[in-house]
Amino acid sequence: YHPAREFAIDLVLFINGLPVATVELKTDFTQSCEAAMDQYRNNRLPYDAKTKRREPLLTFKRGAVVHFAMSDSEIMMATKLDGENTFFLPFNKGRKDESGTVHAGNPPGEIKADGTQEYPVAYFWEEVCQPNAWLRIFHSFVYVEKKDVVDIQGNWSKKETLIFPRFHQWTAVNQMLADARENGAGMTYLCDHSAGSGKTSTISWTAHDLVKLREDNGDAVFNSVIIVTDRNVLDGQLQDAVKQIDHQFGVIAAIDRQKSSKSKSKQLSDALLSGTPIVVVTIQTFPYAMEAIITDKALKGKNFAVIIDEAHNSQTGSTAAKLQAALGMSGQGKMSTMTVDELLEQLQKSRARPDNISYFAFTGTPKHSTLMLFGRPTDPSQPISDDNPPQAFHLYTMRQAIEEKFILDVLNGYVPYKTAFNLSKQLEDSKRVSGKAAKRALAQWMSLHPTNVT
């Protein structure tokens, strides 16, 4: 990429002659993935260190979209090269241990027919780099996220981040889409994605792809996608992410009483009847949507996808009582304190839950009721039971998020009161202690709790 200085990158991937990705390769026998990241930070600068001339291939928003640091066993990626400030994200599948807990990294490579073992990172060229998959990533996933940020002096500015999907985001969206294409409306999907998983982007990609999903005859699988957010005031971050993926006018309608003179029910009715592709509502407005879908004759025969973000945490409010009355459901009066999970469970029991709606639930802390409502049986051919419990459709564990350094392991700072009291009491009772006893007490303090996060 710089003939005069004989700089060369191991691998560059092109689409129609345009460079879209670079790869620095290392082998674990001599160097690790960390060495490839250091090479990007120190030697793959977006400008020539001597002449200060820009390197087009490595310049943000000008050259390659993503830069991969790859060893035999791990893959990391960055979308902006910025010297020592270059930030890498993992692009790994996750590795299960014997207990079933998913950790950071990749599983061992498969044994091939000739007896040799495949590389743990073989999924990169066997799955990700396949022509259709590779093209779809750049067509449907890559986008520029724009945020207003303020510095320490109080000055506001626009921050741009080029978003490339992490591996679990890419697989989650693809698997849900493939299942929805095969089975149509009326299905449930539970994405058990921990904090640090990038749920906002995953929800946005899912919504846009569901809108574009088509039957073999060209008809839309879902006429509208309803996104339910866990906030009284519509989640600006989620709305912005959804809008930034597709800039077409009229694709998204946000049902917000503060931004329209129309009532929420009227806004919803207009959006659903006009076939607005993506409709964003709050938990409190969600019962209006369910009432319209179930009772409005003009919406009969239409299919809907409902994406629920952390729905089990918030209450639906008094609007749910109107839905309850409209459907003739029992237990009137309790509806205002229900969560969305409980509301849908009530619909299911009343047999009013329509089969023209698919539910896509995203949560990092699924309750038992959430699993029962949105989970799939371990053995799909058998009903849910104690021997065949429900499970999430897709999983990104807290343990993996901790090991990938997206969230902190709070148990590292966990001190049981009893242990702390006993140690403090011993110190009070004996003012002078031997060095050996003190070291033993400190050792106990350092290994307080064996609990693991899964």
Regions found by a protein language model. Name each.
Residues 1-225, 229, 233, 237-249, ...:
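ATP-dependent helicase/translocase motor core
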Residues 45, 49-70, 255-256, 305-307, ...:
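Phosphate/diphosphate-binding loops
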Residues 68-69, 279-282, 357-363:
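Structural recognition of the conserved hydrophobic beta-strand(s) that form the central parallel beta-sheet
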Residues 114-122, 156-160, 338-357:
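Intrinsically disordered, low-complexity acidic Ser/Thr-rich regulatory segments
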Residues 224, 275-278, 302-305, 355-360:
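Loop/turn-to-beta-strand initiation segments
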Residues 243-291:
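Inter-Walker segment of RecA-like/P-loop motor cores
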Residues 269, 276-308, 314-325, 332-349:
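Conserved RecA-like ASCE ATPase "motif II neighborhood" in helicase/translocase motors
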Residues 369-454:
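Interdomain helical connector at the RecA1-RecA2 junction of SF1/SF2 helicase-like NTPases
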